[in-house]
Amino acid sequence: TKCYITPDVKSETCPDGENICYTKSWCDVFCTSRGKRIDLGCAATCPKVKPGVDIKCCSTDNCNPFTPWKRH
C-alpha cells in the first residue's frame, strides 16, 4: 500500500504489514489561527485515538490526501 506521510505529504510505500493509511487531525493552541494539526501515515490497524482527535482510515493506495489550506 502507498500512503501519504507527514511531514512532507509525499506518497510513500508502507512497510510490510502496514496496509492502512490514516489521516489524524486535532486542535492545539494554534487551532484558531492555523487550523487543525494533521498527521498522515501508515499503520497495521486503524490507530485508536484520544477524545478530541479525529481519525480517518482507508486501505487503497494514496487514499489519505491532504491539501494544505491557503493563507490570505
UniProtKB/Swiss-Prot annotation:
Tissue: Expressed by the venom gland.
Main location: secreted
UniProt cross-references to Pfam families, sorted A to Z: Toxin_cobra-type
Protein name: Long neurotoxin OH-17
Tree of life domain: Eukaryota
Location relative to the cell: Secreted
Entry-linked CDD domains: TFP_snake_toxin (cd00206)
Disulfide bonds, paired cysteine numbers: C3-C21, C14-C42, C27-C31, C46-C57, C58-C63
InterPro entries referenced in this protein's UniProt entry, alphabetically: Snake_3FTx, Snake_toxin-like_sf, Snake_toxin_con_site, Toxin_cobra-type
GO cellular component assignments: extracellular region
Recorded GO MF terms: acetylcholine receptor inhibitor activity; ion channel regulator activity; toxin activity
Family per similarity comment: Belongs to the three-finger toxin family. Long-chain subfamily. Type II alpha-neurotoxin sub-subfamily.
Cited PROSITE patterns: SNAKE_TOXIN
